[in-house]
UniProtKB/Swiss-Prot annotation:
Species this protein is from: Erythrobacter litoralis (strain HTCC2594)
Protein name per the record: Pyridoxine/pyridoxamine 5'-phosphate oxidase
Pathway named in the protein's UniProt entry: Cofactor metabolism; pyridoxal 5'-phosphate salvage; pyridoxal 5'-phosphate from pyridoxamine 5'-phosphate: step 1/1; Cofactor metabolism; pyridoxal 5'-phosphate salvage; pyridoxal 5'-phosphate from pyridoxine 5'-phosphate: step 1/1
PANTHER family from the UniProt entry: PYRIDOXINE-5'-PHOSPHATE OXIDASE, PYRIDOXINE-5-PHOSPHATE OXIDASE
Catalytic reaction annotation: pyridoxamine 5'-phosphate + O2 + H2O = pyridoxal 5'-phosphate + H2O2 + NH4(+); pyridoxine 5'-phosphate + O2 = pyridoxal 5'-phosphate + H2O2
Lineage: Bacteria, Pseudomonadati, Pseudomonadota, Alphaproteobacteria, Sphingomonadales
Keyword vocabulary terms for this entry: Flavoprotein, FMN, Oxidoreductase, Pyridoxine biosynthesis
GO-annotated biological processes: pyridoxine biosynthetic process
Residues involved in substrate binding: K62, Y119, R123, S127, R187, L188, H189
Gene3D superfamilies per record: Electron Transport, Fmn-binding Protein, Chain A
Amino acid sequence: MQSEESIMTDLATSEIPETDPFALFAEWMEEARASELNDPNAMALATATPDGAPSVRMVLLKDHGPQGFTFYTNAESRKGEEIRANAQTALLFHWKSLRRQIRVEGPVREVAPEVADAYFHSRARESQLGAVASDQSRPLEDRRVFVDRFRAAQERFDEGEVERPAYWTGFTVTPQRIEFWCDRPNRLHDRRLFTLSGAGDALSWTSTLLYP
């Protein structure tokens, strides 16, 4: 059994390295894929209206790297409308199996149409038809109406390629702040914040430890 003195000695060293935040994110995501039972790429997406009224929901991360963190959705949904009105967003990844979380903050931009097309057509056909049938975030009088819309989409496209609706697209959050958190004994948790600074070719990431 580890002694209290040994535990305290270990706690004096951060377990979150001062490194490339995107490489660290990729490493943690791979570990999450190996340990989380469901949807390790699930993330909470927070948006807000221009006057600051917030809303949050779970979405799935579909791409990540120095370019940002990408997800896909109906642009006419509540989140889509809020993104168009206020580009500032925040993401949260929480992996209970690893006792870790990552927070991301930054503006969001829409992906190119060809990128949205490629991802849309990589999805299961039923998911494509569901996107066509769903009037996301709008009132639904009866579930049977939704099923009827799905069947109508099936008939419309028959065996042909399902056309991506113009309102269905992708968004990429360009991070300006990325914070990594991990659980440690005695609630002396580990936090490291990476902040983007500079401009143009002089952009760089700086990191600092935070009190938990």
